[in-house]
Amino acid sequence: FELPELKLLVDAVQASRFITESKSRSLIKKLESLVSVHDARQLQRQVLIAGRVKTMNESIYYNIDKLHTAIGEGKQIRFQYFQWTVEKKEALRRDGGWYCVSPWHLRWDDENYYLIAYDAEADRVKHYRVDKMKRITLLEAPRLGQEKMARSDLAVYTQQLFGMYG
């Protein structure tokens, strides 16, 4: 890497809302190890982002990794899903019941990762915010929904879905 490239990566890590403060420091230290001590000092900088709060959810990195694995291996997953209460506490949806879906894509939009998956029970494509998913487990069952995914225009789906947030 050239130093300007590493500076750009450091800035992106610091600015990213889904990366916790501790994980940001850890990643930046790893980037610093790629250059001399003198150049590493230039990477020790703070990017000021207005109105930005970093996540406290350390498990998101492992969730993303599990989801990529499930997508790559063509496996179904199960997980619990939560929402935030007005008291800013996690409340599991479906009274803590499990969601079982076939993951097809991960989408990064407006500082959040979303899973786009086929829900066989509902027979439709759905999306889930990855930072609200808990206890993700890969199942041995093969992924379903190939025909439904092939028939759906993913570009139109994501534009309609994520366009309403922007």
Residue ranges and their predicted role:
Residues E2-K88:
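Bulky hydrophobic/aromatic content
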Residues V37-Q42, Y61-D65, R93-G96, K132-L139:
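A broad, low-specificity signal for short, low-complexity segments enriched in glycine/proline
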Residues L48-R52, V86-K89, C100, R107-W108, ...:
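N-terminal start-of-chain detector that recognizes signal peptides
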Residues K66-L67, P103, Q159-G163:
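Generic recognition of flexible, low-complexity loop/linker segments
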Residues H68-E121, K126:
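Loop-centered beta-sheet repeat module
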Residues Y114-G166:
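Surface-exposed, charged, gly/pro-rich loop-and-adjacent secondary-structure segments at domain edges
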